[in-house]
A protein has these predicted regions:
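Hinge/lid segment of periplasmic solute-binding proteins
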Residues: 45, 67-116, 131-136
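Ligand-binding pocket segment of bilobal, Venus flytrap-like solute-binding proteins
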Residues: 148-151, 158-165, 169-242
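Short beta-strand->loop
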Residues: 78-91, 111, 239-251, 261-263
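Extracellular/periplasmic juxtamembrane helices and adjacent flexible linkers that interface
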Residues: 266-269, 277-341
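A bilobed periplasmic-binding-protein/Venus flytrap-type ligand-binding module shared by bacterial periplasmic
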Residues: 120-127, 254-267, 286-290
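Short helix-loop capping/hinge motifs at secondary-structure junctions, enriched
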Residues: 126-135, 168-175, 263-270
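Structural recognition of the beta-strand scaffold that forms the well-ordered cores
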Residues: 5-8, 35-37, 57-61, 113, ...
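Early extracytoplasmic/lumenal segment of secretory-pathway proteins
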Residues: 1-73
Length: 341
């Protein structure tokens, strides 16, 4: 048996998934078995490096990673044949999610939508009274939450987005200016003693801690930022973490299934069978129920938060593939904030 190597995020592929999909491959006569590589996905640069070193065959890329940094990852992927007879579950995917420009190459998708979520902030309602729950992103800068909330470290653009929202800009305003190549406006916006940089430094100074691939729960944190999956685990243990529904909305992301460029022939066909399994009803319902994610499939009993907030996936709050210019400007902001931290 040959290996089909999956590169994915923590919690996305269970041992039971592997057993089931390997049974399907055997029953269909494929000479392939899947395994999940030990390296877990963390961020765009790390995923690019693992794919470039040819350490995986099927990936679970966050959509906007595909065209980040001069579209470097897109060059390592192949378009999905959405009419493949092996992708029988594709028709149940939300049509709003199947042809998003940042995942397309010459009108063909480099991705199959899988599931997503938001960069959410969750509050411990065991410790915080209902009337004290924040309502605006701006509240994160209040003294009462100093050292009591956490931020993600690797994907710092979310924190830049929050800062811009807190100053009444669009969260992707930096990218909008960069795409227009409006360097004068960018220079003014990011001036050394300017409002944006100062606000961003305050955010980094006020945080009670950073996390990388999955959020940490420590005694002093009343608010944790999270992609969602860990919240369910805590609440199943008796926790009472609740999404803070910021009036500015939530920055959203979509994770996808992708095939590396070298897959072909029987191996590519086997990869399509695997992808089709991961968009079936059972798996899609599991990511809602167990990971608190937003599913790509519409043919489900519950779509989680989408049942209550149907616009989470259609808003203009899907993180874009940042251009080299805006990305490097944000990196400089982080360096300046870290120097003062």
């Amino acid at each position: 048996m040959e290996k089909l190597r999956i590169f994915t995020w923590t919690g996305y592929v269970t041992p039971e998934n592997i057993t089931q999909v390997n049974k399907i491959l055997v029953n269909k006569g494929y000479n392939y078995q899947v395994e999940v590589i030990a390296t877990k996905a963390e961020d765009a640069d790390q995923m690019f490096s693992v794919i470039r070193k040819k350490q995986c065959d099927i990936t679970f890329l966050t959509l906007f990673f595909i065209k980040m940094h001069g579209e470097q990852i897109s060059k390592l992927l192949q378009p999905i044949n959405i009419n493949s007879p092996r992708l029988t579950n594709y028709k149940n995917l939300d049509p709003k999610l199947t042809h998003i420009a940042m995942g397309m190459q010459q009108d063909k998708p480099l991705y199959i939508p899988w599931g997503g979520g938001i960069y959410g902030f969750f509050i411990n309602t065991h410790k915080v009274e209902k009337q004290d729950i924040p309502t605006s992103v701006k509240d994160l800068w209040a003294d009462k939450w100093r050292n009591k909330f956490s931020l993600n470290q690797g994907q710092f653009w979310y924190n830049v987005g929050l800062t811009l929202q807190a100053l009444d800009f669009h969260p992707f305003y930096l990218e909008q200016l960069a795409l227009k190549n409006d360097r004068k406006a960018l220079k003014e916006l990011l001036a050394k003693q300017g409002a944006v940089l100062n606000k961003f430094k305050q955010l980094y100074n006020n945080t009670g801690g950073f996390w990388q691939s999955s959020t940490k729960f420590t005694e002093h944190l009343d608010i944790v930022s999270s992609w969602g999956p860990e919240i369910k685990v805590q609440n199943d243990k008796g926790g009472k973490w609740q999404l803070i529904d910021f009036k500015e909305g939530h920055l959203a992301w979509l994770d996808t299934i992708n095939f590396v460029r070298d897959l072909k022939g029987e191996k590519l066909a086997a990869a399509e069978v695997v992808a089709n399994y991961f968009i079936n009803r059972q798996v899609q319902q599991r990511i809602v129920n167990e990971l608190s994610m937003l599913p790509a499939s519409i043919d489900l009993e519950s779509r989680g938060l989408l049942d209550h907030y149907p616009n989470l996936f259609s808003a203009d709050l899907f993180v874009p593939p940042y251009s080299q210019l805006s990305y490097s400007l944000m990196q400089q902001m982080v360096e300046q904030a870290s120097d003062s931290h």
